[in-house]
């Protein structure tokens, strides 16, 4: 049966970031940091190359990043692939998008997939150039790739606020060496640390995000983040994807989305309390 994704919400920055408190500049009552409202528009350069154009509600043509600001967005996420078959989401394409975001004064999240194409809970394929690597060599490749991309951005004056070390890594990344299951997460922990250490080396103030899916499923969330704690995985923020509604052929409609959204929202304060993130 073919399922159609209706919605993807990345909740870590869009929700958890707004929940903590920081000291007031005047020394008074602590204030909450500004809410980060963001979107992943990593596909827009490819769309532009194919002739797609973007317009405001009033019909004014704008480039996609510029269109985000009047819609109330202040943050953008860009995914990174290692050696994509086409240039999209490779280092130079990501740099171009980040420079545009910088011009607009928007905060930036970098999302490392550590793959040549999409990585998600159902596929975490090792980049073709890395397929013969053992765990030690793979960890070095993760570190080198992370450092290379981030230093390229930093050298061009781009500031990065958040970095995802892996994308939807519920079942690990860089399979099989970095697979996560009930028996083991040690390989993943080593690979994640290799990436996270380089994030802090290049951007010491950037938040390292540990990102999984199924924000509505508290059993999965507790299993995963407790397993990470037991394996000594260090990170700054929890990142969650939410797919609240899929197409159901038997009813010829999308399933109701409200229950999963409400459950995801209810899970966030519990995660903050349990894992101090």
What does each of the following model-derived ranges do?
Residues 2-10:
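Sec-dependent signal peptide recognition
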Residues 114, 171, 244:
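Short, glycine/acidic-enriched loop or turn micro-motifs at the edges of active sites
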Residues 232, 242, 246, 275-276:
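Alpha-helix capping/termination and helix-coil
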């Amino acid at each position: 049966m073919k399922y159609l994704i209706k919605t993807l919400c990345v909740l870590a920055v869009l929700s958890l970031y707004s929940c903590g408190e920081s000291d007031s500049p005047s020394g008074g009552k602590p204030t909450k940091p500004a809410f980060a409202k963001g979107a992943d528009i990593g596909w827009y350069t490819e769309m532009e190359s194919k002739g797609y154009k973007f317009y405001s509600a009033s019909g004014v043509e704008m480039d996609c990043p510029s269109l985000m600001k009047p819609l109330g967005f202040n943050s953008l996420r860009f995914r990174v692939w290692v050696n994509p078959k086409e240039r999209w989401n490779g280092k130079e394409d990501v740099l171009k998008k980040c420079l545009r975001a910088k011009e607009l004064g928007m905060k930036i999240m970098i999302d490392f997939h550590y793959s040549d194409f999409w990585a998600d809970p159902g596929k975490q394929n090792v980049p073709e150039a890395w397929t013969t690597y053992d765990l030690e060599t793979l960890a070095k490749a993760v570190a080198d790739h992370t450092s290379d991309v981030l230093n390229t951005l930093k050298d061009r004056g781009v500031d990065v606020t958040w970095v995802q070390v892996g994308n939807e890594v519920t079942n690990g990344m860089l399979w099989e060496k970095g697979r996560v299951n009930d028996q083991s997460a040690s390989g993943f922990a080593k690979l994640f640390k290799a990436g996270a250490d380089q994030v802090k080396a290049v951007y010491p103030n950037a938040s390292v995000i540990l990102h999984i899916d199924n924000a509505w499923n508290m059993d999965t969330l507790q299993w995963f983040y407790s397993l990470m704690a037991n394996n000594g995985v260090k990170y700054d923020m929890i990142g969650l994807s939410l797919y609240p509604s899929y197409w159901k052929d038997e009813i010829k409609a999308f399933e109701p989305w409200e229950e999963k959204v409400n459950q995801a929202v209810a899970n966030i304060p519990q995660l903050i309390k349990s894992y101090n993130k």
